[in-house]
Every structure is written in C-alpha cells, then in structure tokens.
C-alpha cells in the first residue's frame, strides 16, 4: 500500500504550507513582472517626453495644485479620460502620458463622485469657479461637493514656493533659476482661491 502522505520535491503543497517560501516566490514574481511591464516605459519617448506646448506650472498654478491635493479633490474627481467614445464625447480628447510628465505625483484619481477634470481648463469662467468653490449649490443645485469658503481669505505662503520648485527641478521639471527666484513675488497677495482657480484653468489646455 502506497503512502500518500509522503511528499517529495518542489510541490504546490510545500509552497502553500511554507510562509517563507511563499513570500520569496511572490517577491520574485512581482519583481519580474515589474521589470517586464515598467522598465520598457522609461525607454519609450511617448511616455517620457512632454506633449508639444506643455509648460511647467507657474508658481500660482503650482500653489493651486498643492491646495487641490491638500483638500483631497482627487478623492472625488479624476484627471484621466479613457479612450472610450462616451468619455471623449463628454470630456474631450483622451488623456496621454505626455500630459503628466511634470506632475509629481499625477492626479489621475480613482473614482468620479464628481466629473473628470482633465479638460476643465477654460470651460468655465474664473467667476464661475469662484462661486462654485465657495458654495457649489449656487451654480449646480444638485451638487454633492462640499463648500470651501475659507479659500477666499487664506493667503498663499510665498516662502513655500521656491523650495517646492527646487525639489521639483530635482525630479526633472525644467524650472529655471529666474523662475524660482521670482516665485515668491508672483504669488504674493494671492489667495488660495485664486491659486486653485489658476490651476483648474490650465488643466488639459495643451491637448483638446
């Protein structure tokens, strides 16, 4: 009579019953998959070069982007238009990698409680955005968006901009010394509402 409980060699059961072996194999598979999927992207120009006309954010726009992140806008709004007809008809040209090369980190988001904002730049006036951010129900009665009245009085901190821009330059954003030196003066006197509107108004304007 054969002994069915005797296992030899590299078996499925041995993998499942050994935590260490399972972890090692998972790490190997993930590492290999990452090399195969991610590394080639660094050598494709379409994913590493900016689209024509793309410029780094101005200091005011950059401050607005920081406010967008701070207030968690990415939790309810995406910035990624998929190449589906329903989305391109509603929002415009589908998103491409070259639009986001200066975004660290990118703001693609993962859900749409509110609409996608990838092409919102220039779609509404500054005044519309001002009213909408202070009280969304004044322009969209059925809106679920929270109010942000404090942005109208909170001022952008000029001292934060130069260090932020220098940090971005280290990761490849082509800010010049002159742009960094003039950043504080450019945002001086700007409210957080001004900055956030400036950021929203630039989104998607390089590719329609």
Predicted region positions:
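Electron-transfer interface patches adjacent to heme c in soluble/periplasmic c-type cytochromes
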Residues: 22-31, 89-193
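The canonical Cys-X-X-Cys-His
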Residues: 64, 70-79, 196, 200
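Bilobed periplasmic-binding protein/Venus flytrap-like ligand-binding cleft at the lobe interface
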Residues: 68, 132-137, 198-203
């Amino acid at each position: 009579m054969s002994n069915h409980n005797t296992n030899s060699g590299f078996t499925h059961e041995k993998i499942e019953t050994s935590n260490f072996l399972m972890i090692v194999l998972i790490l190997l598979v993930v590492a290999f998959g990452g090399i195969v999927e991610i590394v080639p992207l660094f050598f494709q120009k379409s994913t590493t070069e900016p689209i024509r006309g793309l410029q780094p954010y101005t200091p005011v726009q950059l401050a607005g982007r920081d406010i967008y992140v701070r207030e968690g806008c990415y939790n309810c709004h995406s910035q990624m238009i998929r190449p589906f007809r329903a989305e391109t008809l509603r929002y415009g040209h589908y998103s491409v990698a070259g639009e986001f090369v200066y975004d660290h980190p990118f703001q693609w988001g993962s859900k749409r409680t509110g609409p996608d904002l990838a092409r919102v730049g220039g779609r509404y006036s500054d005044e519309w955005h001002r009213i909408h951010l202070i009280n969304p129900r004044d322009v969209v009665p059925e809106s679920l968006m929270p109010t942000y009245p404090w942005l109208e009085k909170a001022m952008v901190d000029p001292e934060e901009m130069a260090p932020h821009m220098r940090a971005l330059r280290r990761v490849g954003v082509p800010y010049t010394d002159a742009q960094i030196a003039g950043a504080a003066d450019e945002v001086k006197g700007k409210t957080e509402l001004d900055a956030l509107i400036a950021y929203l108004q630039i989104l998607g304007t390089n590719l329609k």
